[in-house]
């Protein structure tokens, strides 16, 4: 794969200054009011079974038993659905299980992911009470036409409102964006990251769009209504997005989807820029662009 880029940027955004252990707890499709066209959370998380309270407790205990470096911070992370869209009592039950490990000193913090339109002051007060210190918003795009086509069910204004509220409550803000959604272009990707950076997220995840079975996007792909990005184009767009982050104090904590038994380049039923080491391609492209610029100076 040949990628020709002309970029002057470094890799400071990829440096994780606060190295820590993360205990991931996936709650597939819990709390989501609708199905976005790209979504099949059970395949994305590699998990079919729903998670009950005893599962949460067992997952935490299992991960804690693996950790050897006790000097590292430990974080519990609820992923896989819109956490704050779950019934409020179930949210509290999940968080109570996690918080007891904070109270006994075994865990330092809790993070979760959710939709921008499922954030309110009432929710944030509760989350603060139970030790949540990072909230990642599924932004995906700041282009309202793209959000509508993707059937997200929220607008860019919801992202702005939720981001400001989260920062008001001194909770660390994370944004998740997707590269290659239907109707997207290099220009809309740049617009999205610029609009996100105005909201000062502390952390960023960048995901190229994969076409996954049993999603509406899969039907669009089969009907030739959608063409996924090539790896080369996805890398090119991601490098441009990363370049926009260089002057900002934002940590890029993931590039590409986490590989699972379902989400892997060996799965012939996943289409798009599927690559088990996508971040390495992006970082290599940045380094190549930086070196080529220095050679001309």
Question: Over which residues does each language-model region extend?
Answer:
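Conserved catalytic loop of SAM-dependent methyltransferase domains
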Residues: 259-263
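N-terminal pre-triad scaffold of radical SAM enzymes
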Residues: 6-45, 57, 62-84, 113-115, ...
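Conserved non-cysteine loop/helix-boundary elements of the Radical SAM core domain that shape
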Residues: 44-58, 66, 80-209, 213-233
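Residue-level detector of conserved catalytic or cofactor/ligand-binding positions
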Residues: 288-297
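Signature of the chemotaxis receptor cytoplasmic signaling rod
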Residues: 1-3
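Radical SAM enzyme [4Fe-4S]-AdoMet core and its adjacent flexible, acidic
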Residues: 208-246, 265-283
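Short glycine-enriched loops at secondary-structure junctions
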Residues: 28-31, 207-212, 258
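C-terminal accessory region of radical SAM enzymes
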Residues: 242-258
